[in-house]
Amino acid sequence: SRMKAQDQKELMRERICDCAKRLFEREGYEQVSMRQIAAEAGIAVGNLTYYFSKKEDLLKERLNDIQETFSESIQLERGEISGKPFWEYENRTLLELLLRFLKAVEQFQKNAAIVYENYSRLQKTVPVFQEMSREWTEKIMTIYNGLIKQLWERRVFRKELEWDEYENLIYLIKLLTFFGQEMHGDQEYEKKRFTERICRLLIPYISWEWKDTYTVLCKEICEVSFHRMTLKFI
């Protein structure tokens, strides 16, 4: 019976989270009140606060779920993929991993749209979000950094360019990853997907011998094709 009560509690928790997710996506996080969430879940506000005392807690829960899904989908930890360090992978596999990672980030952005559309505002107004997003940004940037550095050291990326140039590139990727979504409604921006923008951004950094492999992988993994003339300039 205690197990049953525990299950029911868990089910109610999930139901509240689903209702909050729907409302946040439909109305926007700022607009939704705890009263609305309770009504949508068909419970009293007092019952709702038993599970979640503040609206922020619901956003945090949502973000936790999305982050877990993302982490599972890529199995990436600091400097390791599926338990193996970056340097144990072949060059081509590393390049593939970078592109697959971009795709996973794009999917994550879609799932977390409500968060990303309000990214800078939420960072200022929701303390718990500020903390989570800092850790999260760090985690994603560590992976970008690790993969790009490894590819640069192996000359898949142009080694004659100083590492400074790549730090600048990584900073641009960071802006597109975390703030690109805020440009919603900007027609020019929305003409291209996140992955396509990054694939194009990386082109001039790819060393000549890897150009063909890179373009093949971009097409296979990210469904991005380049004009022949563009490639002539690399």
Please provide the spans of the model-predicted regions.
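Helix-turn-helix
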Residues: 15, 19, 23-61
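Short, Lys/Arg-enriched N-terminal segments with co-localized hydrophobic residues
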Residues: 1-2
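Short, basic, alpha-helical segments at the C-terminal edge of helix-turn-helix-like DNA-binding modules
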Residues: 64-71
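Amphipathic alpha-helical packing segments from all-alpha helical-bundle domains
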Residues: 128-156, 164-175, 199-203
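Hydrophobic alpha-helical connector segments
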Residues: 61, 75-114, 170
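C-terminal peripheral helix-coil segments that are non-catalytic and often amphipathic
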Residues: 149-150, 182-234
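Amphipathic alpha-helical segments used for helix-helix packing
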Residues: 109-131, 145-146
